[in-house]
């Protein structure tokens, strides 16, 4: 069988994952499958030779949830505050949650529901040789190849972003060598310890088959717990050979190849949707290459919109297994750092689309029933999954996240009113597509009020990077105003004229003086999280109010409210420093810092915000750096994949390239599966992260990695751009293109050993900024195309002014 590169992507080398083994996680092989997706439909290929499984999912298929009817318990807020004023912190922390419990409030979260498995069984006459499974990220094609005797075989699959169909082709090198038995059925779980097929699915699943002329069809459907059907139709198109239909299977034998086309439906009625999908499948072309070309024309430009090169060409053909073995030696290979950056972008592009839902923590490839931590969690995780989008040129794919929260605003207003008696919105940290009421009825979640404000920065960043004033006026500012209204009612003015925030939670942490000895707490993960004046609360509020004032003036709205917001800003207390020289996590004397924790949200003013930099406030910057250092040194065994990714982003922002790289290295050694999915924690008792046997897949770290690499190479704020601010020694040479500035784009290449750096800036809107070059770069010159100029502003600094449509090239060293 010749390699005709029908994928339309990269034939070999960069932007490919290569594995020498099939998915092998016992009972949960989906965890190591290779993913393909079109933003709403996902397919995960296990890679078995004899009995292949392809897990099929749809982003809108969730089950098991039930929104609660929230009672009005706003009277508890003054009660909680009285308790806290009297030092009864434990009682105060639990009061809201206990009150809801006494009133019988219950809200149940949904989880993703796997749609179906495609099983492909084939006879094996001799043992396999030269096995490979690959993912071409440029095209989204997953392929499995092997040899048996003198024959070679391949299965190739992608999910079309153009035609909304799963396309799979079975190939053999010898005419008539393709034989397979095909079946659609409920997703199978092999691990008895985890939940199996839901009763509603098991009792309602139905399969029918038919061979009509040269085509075969398999129809599959089952019922969700809401009584609505979901399912799929498979069309089988063999080239040559024979095709027969059994009760629930279709068999192909003696074929040269076989094309499989699958369309899925959710929230429907099986008979009607089967007929509709059969008509759609009958109208689709029958050539794999043609369908791939149509899909690649949409997927490819998204994936190739940005590129980073850190590795030599000689490294590009390594397998995932080889990359991981090298990472275990302790040094993160530049090629693995690059590949993980590309893979995170691939997962994001494949896991969401503009008219869909935000990407969830499992992407579109969850194979668990009742999956752990599968909801959208906005006390860091959702935000981490979108940190990369603007600089990475994928701002348009943040729109589903904005729409998701906007569509639930009335429930968020109800939450704020009934829980706290406040105007504006209260967004629970955890939500699902069908449930925006609080379903984590515990103090650490209920008493945290920062989700709306933290999410608001993403709305404003979208405006900053697109210049879309309609979005600013009609969507960003109204959302931000609702978040600010909540703070207006929730914050209290203390006797010294400063604001108080209480109860106040620093996400998922408990002050050190409220922790049991030895940090063990009888299974209660958060013994006393509710404090006064969490630093994060005021960091979020300060950024929100600053941007709301700025944006309102730009858009010419809310003029009568700006004075109020300015007064609130003036009343926000200053950040405080503890006896260790670290920024305090709680700005109140009754609450001591606790460094042994995975969350590090109080570093928000440094990252993701731009409030504190070394240039603006060197002393405070050092105090933030000390708080970060103590987290990593003291609490390495308390970290997770996403916390290592968060730390990498923070160290990159602090221009500590070696430490940022070490965080990525720790992540790779502890929380990376062989298909490069990130999991929450290590499962092998290796001492680097938390220990949790199930180690759930959590793709926040995959996407946090993308942001960290970008931050290491490029710092972007509205008025400042820093080239290579956090470049580790291992990345001595490389290039980047397609990364975004607030008003345009930038491409650059460097070789530190030679002191060379070349950067080209393109302005799409009026651009005025300070550009900082790395200290190792030599003397620089500039050349403009169009109305643009660069003026020296101190060592390694230039003031850049560019008109729309102009280009400016900066060259340093002997470039």
Q: What kind of region is each of these model predictions?
A:
Residues 448-462, 475-489, 643, 660, ...:
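Extended, hydrophobic alpha-helical segments in both membrane/secreted and soluble proteins
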Residues 468-469:
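Short loop-to-helix capping motifs
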Residues 334-338, 473-478, 642-645:
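Alpha-helical scaffolds flanking conserved acidic
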Residues 33-56, 60, 99, 112-114, ...:
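C-terminal capping/lid segments that line or modulate ligand- or cofactor-binding pockets
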Residues 2-443, 450, 461-463, 481-484, ...:
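Aromatic-residue-lined binding/catalytic grooves and analogous aromatic/hydrophobic interfacial grooves
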Residues 418-420, 448-461, 497-505:
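Core alpha/beta catalytic barrel or barrel-like domain that forms the active/cofactor pocket
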Residues 172, 761-765:
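Asparagine-centered strand-capping/turn motif at beta-strand->loop junctions
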Residues 355-364, 472-474, 492-502, 557-564, ...:
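Short, glycine/acidic-rich hinge or "gate" loops at secondary-structure transitions
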């Amino acid at each position: 069988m010749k390699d005709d590169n029908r994928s339309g992507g990269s034939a070999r080398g960069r932007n490919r994952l290569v594995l020498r083994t099939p998915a092998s996680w016992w009972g949960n092989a989906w965890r190591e499958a290779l993913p393909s997706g079109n933003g709403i439909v996902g397919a995960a290929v296990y890679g078995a030779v004899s009995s292949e499984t392809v897990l099929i999912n749809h982003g809108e298929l969730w089950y098991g949830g039930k929104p609660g009817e929230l009672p009005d318990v706003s009277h508890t807020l003054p009660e909680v505050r009285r308790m806290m004023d009297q030092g009864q912190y434990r009682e105060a922390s639990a009061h809201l949650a206990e009150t809801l419990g006494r009133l019988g409030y219950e809200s149940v979260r949904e989880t993703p529901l796997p749609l179906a498995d495609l099983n492909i069984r084939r006879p094996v006459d001799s043992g396999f040789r030269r096995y490979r499974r690959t993912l071409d990220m440029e095209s989204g094609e997953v392929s499995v190849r092997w040899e048996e005797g003198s024959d070679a075989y391949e299965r190739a699959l992608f999910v079309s972003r153009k035609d909304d169909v799963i396309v799979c082709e079975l190939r053999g090198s010898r005419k008539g060598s393709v034989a397979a038995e095909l079946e659609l059925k409920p997703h199978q779980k092999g691990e008895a310890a985890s939940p199996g097929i839901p009763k509603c699915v098991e009792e309602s699943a139905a399969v029918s088959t038919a061979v009509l002329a040269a085509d075969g069809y398999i129809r599959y459907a089952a019922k969700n717990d809401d009584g609505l059907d979901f399912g799929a139709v498979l069309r089988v198109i063999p080239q040559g050979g024979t095709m027969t239909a059994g009760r629930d299977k279709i068999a192909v034998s003696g074929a040269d190849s076989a094309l499989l086309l699958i369309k899925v439906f959710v929230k429907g009625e099986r008979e009607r949707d089967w007929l509709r999908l059969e008509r759609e499948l009958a109208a689709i072309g029958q050539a794999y290459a043609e369908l791939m070309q149509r899909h690649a024309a949409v997927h490819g430009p998204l994936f190739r919109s940005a590129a980073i090169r850190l590795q030599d060409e000689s490294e590009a053909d390594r397998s995932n297994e080889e990359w991981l073995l090298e990472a275990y030696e302790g040094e993160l290979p530049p090629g693995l750092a690059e590949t993980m950056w590309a893979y995170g972008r691939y997962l994001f592009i494949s896991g969401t689309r503009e008219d869909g839902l935000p990407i969830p923590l499992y992407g579109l490839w969850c194979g668990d029933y009742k999956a752990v931590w599968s909801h959208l969690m906005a006390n860091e995780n959702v935000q981490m999954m979108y940190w990369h989008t603007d600089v990475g040129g994928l701002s348009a794919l943040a729109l589903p996240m904005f729409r998701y929260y906007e569509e639930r605003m009335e429930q968020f207003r109800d939450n704020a009113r009934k829980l706290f008696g406040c105007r504006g919105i209260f967004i629970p940290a955890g939500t699902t597509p069908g449930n925006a009421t609080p379903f984590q009825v515990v103090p650490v979640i209920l008493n945290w009020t920062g989700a709306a404000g933290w999410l608001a920065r993403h709305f404003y960043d979208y405006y900053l990077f697109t210049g879309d004033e309609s979005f600013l006026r009609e969507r960003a500012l109204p959302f931000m105003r609702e978040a600010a209204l909540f703070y207006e009612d929730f914050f209290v003015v203390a006797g010294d004229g400063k604001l108080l925030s209480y109860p106040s939670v620093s996400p998922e942490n408990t002050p050190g003086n409220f922790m049991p000895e030895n940090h063990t707490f009888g299974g209660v993960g958060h013994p006393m999280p509710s404090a006064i004046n969490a630093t994060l609360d005021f960091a979020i509020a300060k950024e929100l109010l600053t941007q709301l004032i700025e944006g309102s003036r730009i858009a010419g709205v809310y003029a009568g409210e700006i004075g109020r917001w300015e007064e609130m800003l003036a009343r926000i207390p200053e950040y405080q420093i503890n006896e260790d020289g670290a920024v305090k996590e709680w700005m109140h004397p009754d609450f001591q810092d606790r460094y042994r924790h995975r969350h590090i949200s109080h570093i928000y003013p440094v990252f993701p915000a731009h409030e504190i930099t070394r240039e603006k406030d060197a002393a405070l910057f050092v105090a933030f750096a000390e708080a970060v250092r103590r987290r990593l040194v003291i609490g390495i065994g308390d970290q997770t994949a996403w916390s290592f990714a968060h730390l990498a982003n923070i160290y990159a922002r602090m221009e500590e390239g070696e430490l940022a790289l070490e965080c990525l290295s720790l992540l790779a050694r502890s929380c990376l599966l062989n298909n490069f999915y990130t999991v929450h924690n290590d499962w092998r008792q290796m001492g680097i992260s938390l220990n949790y046997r199930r180690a759930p897949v959590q793709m926040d770290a995959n996407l946090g990695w993308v942001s960290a690499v970008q931050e290491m190479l490029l710092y972007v704020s509205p008025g400042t751009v820093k080239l290579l601010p956090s470049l580790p020694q291992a990345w001595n040479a490389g290039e980047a293109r397609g990364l975004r500035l607030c008003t345009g784009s930038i491409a650059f290449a460097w070789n530190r050993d030679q002191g060379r750096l070349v950067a080209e800036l393109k302005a799409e809107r009026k651009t005025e900024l300070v550009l900082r070059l790395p200290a190792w770069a030599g003397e620089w010159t500039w050349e403009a195309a169009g109305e643009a100029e660069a003026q020296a502003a101190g060592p390694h600094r230039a003031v850049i002014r560019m008109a729309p449509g102009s280009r400016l090239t900066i060259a340093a060293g002997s470039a």
